Amino acid sequence: MIKVGIVGGTGYTGVELLRLLAQHPQAEVAVITSRSEAGVAVADMYPNLRGHYDGLAFSVPDSKALGACDVVFFATPHGVAHALAGELLAAGTKVIDLSADFRLQDATEWGKWYGQPHGAPELLKDAVYGLPEVNREKIRQARLIAVPGCYPTATQLGFLPLLEAGLADPSRLIADCKSGVSGAGRGAAVGSLFCEAGESMKAYAVKGHRHLPEISQGLRLAAGKDIGLTFVPHLTPMIRGIHATLYANVVDTSVDLQALFEKRYADEPFVDVMPAGSHPETRSVRGANVCRIAVHRPQGGDLVVVLSVIDNLVKGASGQAVQNLNILFGLDERMGLSHAGLLP
């Protein structure tokens, strides 16, 4: 049994991680931390987990207790893993970080987007970007895994086949993305209130979103050259979900794009390339660790439209973290993640 610790279990990604691990046959949560909720039983905080964690309570972070775990997940705001990851790695504990702390390879770039100096630049050389569809073999050997963000997951998986094949003009990529309100986190904020977010949709961070450098980094590696990306996120009145509408100009219109995407993801357990002409819906992946993709070429021209949907809390966060856990410990990649999407 894999002994698991979780730092920061009171946010949406934390409780989703608890939900998924409760059904994992090879993982046992031994430690879960929260300074604000120390002493509170997990089952009291989250009634949906009654019967799964009845003996587990939140505790103040303790390096010794966390260091005794085989793996520690960080479901925390940025900056927290900087302070604790090094000590855990020195103790031989694996780290899977759901925050943005180790996603960018450039510490200076990270500081520019997150408004503070990188707290552990010496660890960046050890960090593996945890997108299994790209870095599976590196994940197997990793000590420190940086779980991709929600927008970056949906966007990269949608663009990858085109860029890897050299088909897309990398200088003219557009990602028009929509997110559910849970993507903003569980903290109290006016913009997340029901009366503010309900029955409305808006774009935000058009000037530049923190996920932009992460997406650009991944697409640049896929293309093998510099890329030009316009990324516009939107807030929509739903709880869960990411819908990415992606645009690229292709340099060869004779290629069968449906076949290209199907071949690229044929062996990927959590990427579903839908039949030609499909329009994937966010509700089809709610609660599931799946990215559903459809590729279109309207009017038969050189403009390609890729539709990519995920649950931002599952394939966009906690589910992908568990997928990384399975790969890291040599388990079946699908273990604990074979949930169908919730309908209605």
Curated annotation (Swiss-Prot):
It is an enzyme of class 1 (oxidoreductase). Pfam families: Semialdhyde_dh, Semialdhyde_dhC_1. Its main location: cytoplasm. The keyword Cytoplasm applies. One of its GO terms (molecular function) is NAD binding. It is found in: Cytoplasm. Pathway: Amino-acid biosynthesis; L-arginine biosynthesis; N(2)-acetyl-L-ornithine from L-glutamate: step 3/4. The active site is at residue 150. One of its GO terms (cellular component) is cytoplasm. GO terms for biological process: L-arginine biosynthetic process. Keywords: Amino-acid biosynthesis, Arginine biosynthesis, Cytoplasm, NADP, Oxidoreductase. Catalyzes the NADPH-dependent reduction of N-acetyl-5-glutamyl phosphate to yield N-acetyl-L-glutamate 5-semialdehyde. HAMAP family: ArgC_type1. Belongs to the NAGSA dehydrogenase family. Type 1 subfamily. This is N-acetyl-gamma-glutamyl-phosphate reductase 1. It comes from Pseudomonas putida (strain ATCC 47054 / DSM 6125 / CFBP 8728 / NCIMB 11950 / KT2440). The lineage of its organism: Bacteria, Pseudomonadati, Pseudomonadota, Gammaproteobacteria, Pseudomonadales.
